[in-house]
């Protein structure tokens, strides 16, 4: 089945939290490829297509799509530059661009856990007992070798490192790429979501609340321009609410009441603007006027639907679920459920979707 950014985020968060719950530490590097799509070598890409036994005619079609592309530059007041033929790069905005890049980096397999989502690459090393040494520098050398062999470039100044787990592992030696020391961060924006080394979501909630509130400005201007309540509501549902809900099943399980209230406050303000209500108007009343649910209710619904998706054996996240109970055991339970709740050692594991979603059985 398809793999979205949410699937990728859930997968890596599960790896982190289960490792931390087992008493291990996690060292993660967020890799930034310099001009990733622009540096894809056409000849190397075609060779990789052939190595994957792609039909010859399809390879020819790819070759026709990639080769003989040219570009030139024009500055206002000056004539065009000479045409220049390109031997690399993917056309911006094309459907084949992301697919081609995925094929290009498919053979990037360092000896550690790696998350690849188009041009976002994340390396994760699980470090065991306190005496265990980190091998991440070795993994980075492998990555650098691959990059050089494939005419790709790693941007050391934008590649970041994060350590999750015991504070005693913060003294791990610094990492370098091409003599550039990687910055160690406590918060990083991964696939649109701010993740932190303590696996709390305060930074992300602050970010999405601020972003959504800034868009209320446009809602007010549209109202002054005379748009109907229906059109204003459509604007909110399509432009503002998605900001508050992106990847919500990932962070909903450990959301605090205060954080949840801050999210609801944004929706309440938007509805008050649309329906000319005051701050004293009950929230439940404006929800009824708009015929929509609270954000908390929608997050629960999104989580239930994701759980139903994960339960499908062909789901890319199906392996994250605990082993199902024996049917004979299930039949003797007062409240029969297919999947048992995983046992945990720490509160960290409660933030994993596989732990939280078993409640939706």
PLM region descriptions:
Residues 98-127:
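Active-site palm subdomain of RNA-directed nucleic acid polymerases
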Residues 115, 180-250:
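Basic, alpha-helical interaction scaffolds
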Residues 1-11, 28-30, 73-100, 124-129, ...:
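Short, conserved non-catalytic motifs in the polymerase core
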Residues 138, 153-186:
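Short, conserved micro-motifs composed of acidic
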Residues 1-90:
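Conserved pre-catalytic core of RNA-dependent polymerases
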Residues 36-52, 106, 121-145, 166:
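Catalytic palm subdomain of template-directed nucleic-acid polymerases
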Residues 256-258, 262-361:
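Short linear motifs embedded in intrinsically disordered, charge-biased segments
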């Amino acid at each position: 089945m398809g793999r979205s950014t949410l699937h990728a985020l859930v997968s890596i968060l599960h790896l982190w939290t289960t490792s931390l719950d087992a008493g291990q530490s996690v060292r993660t590097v967020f890799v930034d490829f310099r001009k990733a799509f622009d540096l894809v070598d056409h000849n190397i890409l075609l060779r990789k297509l052939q190595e994957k036994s792609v039909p010859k005619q399809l390879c020819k079609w790819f070759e026709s799509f990639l080769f003989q592309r040219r570009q030139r530059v024009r500055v206002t007041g000056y004539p065009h530059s000479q045409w220049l033929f390109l031997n690399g790069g993917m056309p911006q905005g094309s459907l084949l661009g992301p697919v081609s890049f995925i094929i290009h980096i498919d053979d990037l397999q360092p000896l550690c856990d790696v998350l690849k989502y188009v041009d976002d690459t994340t390396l994760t090393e699980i470090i065991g007992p306190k005496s265990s040494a980190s091998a991440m520098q070795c993994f980075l050398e492998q990555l650098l070798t691959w990059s050089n062999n494939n005419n790709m470039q790693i941007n050391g100044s934008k590649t970041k490192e994060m350590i999750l787990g015991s504070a005693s592992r913060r003294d791990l030696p610094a990492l370098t790429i091409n003599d550039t020391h990687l910055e160690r961060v406590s918060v990083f924006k991964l696939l649109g979501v701010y993740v932190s080394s303590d696996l709390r979501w305060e930074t992300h909630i602050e970010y999405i609340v601020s972003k959504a509130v800034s868009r209320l400005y446009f809602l007010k201007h549209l109202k002054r321009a005379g748009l109907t309540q229906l059109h204003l509501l459509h604007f909110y549902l399509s432009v503002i609410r998605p900001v508050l809900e992106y990847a919500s099943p990932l962070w909903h399980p450990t959301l605090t009441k205060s954080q949840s209230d801050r999210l609801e406050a944004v929706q309440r303000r938007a509805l008050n603007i649309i329906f000319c209500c005051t701050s004293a108007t009950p929230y439940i009343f404006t929800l009824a006027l708009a015929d929509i649910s609270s954000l908390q209710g929608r997050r629960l619904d999104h989580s239930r639907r994701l759980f139903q998706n994960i339960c499908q054996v062909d789901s890319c996240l199906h392996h994250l679920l605990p082993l199902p109970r024996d049917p004979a055991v299930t039949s003797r339970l007062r409240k029969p459920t297919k999947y048992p709740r995983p046992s945990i050692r720490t509160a960290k594991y409660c933030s994993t979707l596989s732990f939280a979603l078993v409640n939706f059985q």
